[in-house]
């Protein structure tokens, strides 16, 4: 079970859609939603420097294209995995299903890719069933369509 999630997405409306989906799936958790990759980078840098893994979320969902940010979701995932030692389940949540982007995300260290839509609940439910394998690092990369 996921206790804490960080959602990095520039669309405030999707923050609400995601939160509603989590509620409908009876996911009791701490959900923090932020709008920029820069803000997420600063949080991970803080957690890394302080060595405080208690504040770090268990799972991070990152939008592919984050407007107003210095870098996109794939670059953020690469940075988290390589600069901060990861320690979280992390993947992309995007309306794109471009195979080249999906492959880039996988190479950057993304563990999953969820196709974003207003009807996100079935994909999140399927992801939640797979989550223990992601947490144990035994799940293969998967695209949830």
Q: Which functions belong to the PLM regions below?
A:
Residues 3-22:
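Conserved acidic segment of CheY-like receiver
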Residues 71-86:
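Short amphipathic alpha-helix used as the core "switch/output" element in two-component signaling
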Residues 71-75, 96-114, 118, 122:
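Alpha4 helix (beta4-alpha4-beta5 surface) of REC/receiver domains from two-component response regulators
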Residues 122-145:
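CheY-like receiver
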Residues 87-99:
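A short, hydrophobic beta-strand element within the central beta-sheet of small alpha/beta folds
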Residues 62-65:
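Active-site residues of response regulator receiver
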Residues 33-59, 123:
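Acidic, metal-coordinating helix/loop segments flanking the phosphotransfer/catalytic sites
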């Amino acid at each position: 079970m996921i206790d804490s999630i960080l959602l990095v997405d520039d669309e405030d409306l999707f923050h609400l859609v995601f939160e509603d989906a989590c509620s409908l799936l009876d996911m009791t958790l701490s959900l923090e939603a932020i709008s920029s990759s820069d803000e997420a980078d600063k949080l991970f840098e803080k957690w890394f420097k302080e060595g405080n893994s208690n504040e770090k979320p268990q799972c991070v969902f990152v939008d592919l294209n984050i407007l107003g940010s210095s870098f996109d979701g794939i670059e953020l995932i690469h940075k988290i995995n390589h600069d901060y030692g990861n320690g979280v389940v992390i993947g992309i949540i995007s309306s794109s299903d471009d195979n080249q982007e999906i492959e880039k995300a996988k190479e950057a260290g993304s563990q999953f890719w969820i196709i974003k839509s207003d009807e996100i609940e079935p994909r999140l439910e399927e992801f939640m069933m797979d989550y223990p394998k992601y947490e144990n690092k035994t799940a293969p990369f998967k695209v949830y369509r």
